[in-house]
Design a protein with these regions (language model features):
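Conserved NAD+-utilizing ADP-ribose enzyme module
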Residues: 2-138, 142-264
């Protein structure tokens, strides 16, 4: 339930239309409003509405209930499967099955990319892949912010390294589960592997490339190609914290297994 008298919100004294506007106009579409009763979607009473984050949760959530699964399928097959579930097909003869809304699976996106930073690359290599850290999921996007108008979230615009992931291979070989949030962010809980929890293993990295031309390709087809260039300026981005490296503005290369900051 959306409660305008909840402590952190009450002090701001917002109106329901202001909250609707904030949710609707958010450039990253981080939140979603849902009517408690779908038949009452025109209500102006906040008590008739639910609000939630589309992704970025640090508390445990039910991915299957909130997110659309990614499956190795075709767009047509995915839509047909969703239609069958929604129509309650599958019951016995004469048996009426109450339709239950089921998230329609989506085919594997052509591009799934995670954005990170020079400061975090050594620790990614050392741990054997991308980690979800304190979140429930590793976040990816289906394109680069600014290059694709459909990409509204999933990666910071100042990301320095692009980690392209072979999602289909990760599903086939590791049974990894992938999801799409309401605002188009691609999410995965990863797998437990090599003593690490919630990992997207580096063997599923299709390519890791710097956004700067002088960085080049670091990883390809699950294999190391090169380290970060020596003397590269490494800056921990604002709001990302982490220890390691040489602090803000330090210089170093990115040798394999080196000590770095936390991955995001």
């Amino acid at each position: 339930m959306l409660k305008l008298n909840w402590g952190p919100i009450k002090s701001l004294n917002p109106t329901f239309p202001e909250i609707q506007s904030a949710v609707r106009d958010s450039d990253k579409q981080r939140f979603a409003l849902k009517p408690r009763d779908p038949a009452n979607d025109a209500s102006s009473d906040p008590a008739d509405w639910l609000i939630r984050a589309n992704q970025g949760h640090s508390i445990k959530v039910d991915s299957e209930a909130l997110l659309r699964p990614i499956a190795i399928t075709t767009p047509q097959a995915a839509e047909e499967a969703g239609a069958d579930d929604a129509n309650g097909e599958g019951g016995g003869e004469g048996e009426k099955v109450k339709p239950v809304p089921v998230p329609v699976p989506v085919p594997v996106p052509e591009t799934v990319v995670h954005g990170t930073y020079f400061a975090f690359w050594p620790s990614i290599v050392a741990s054997g892949g991308l980690k979800r850290m304190g979140r429930n999921h590793v976040h990816c996007s289906t394109g680069l912010p600014g290059d694709d108008e459909s990409v509204v979230s999933g990666m910071r615009k100042d990301a320095e390294l692009l980690v392209y992931v072979d999602v289909e291979r990760s599903i086939r070989e590791a049974g990894m589960k992938w999801w799409v949030s309401e605002n188009g962010v691609v999410l995965t809980e990863g797998v437990d592997e090599g003593g690490e929890e919630g990992l997207v293993p580096a063997r599923f990295f299709r390519e890791v490339v710097g956004r700067r031309k002088d960085v080049g390709v670091l990883w390809r087809d699950g294999e190391w190609v090169a380290d970060l260039p020596e003397g590269l300026k490494v800056v921990v981005p604002v709001g990302k914290g982490g220890r390691g490296g040489r602090g803000r503005g330090g210089r170093r290369g990115g040798g394999r297994g080196g000590r770095g900051g936390m991955e995001v």
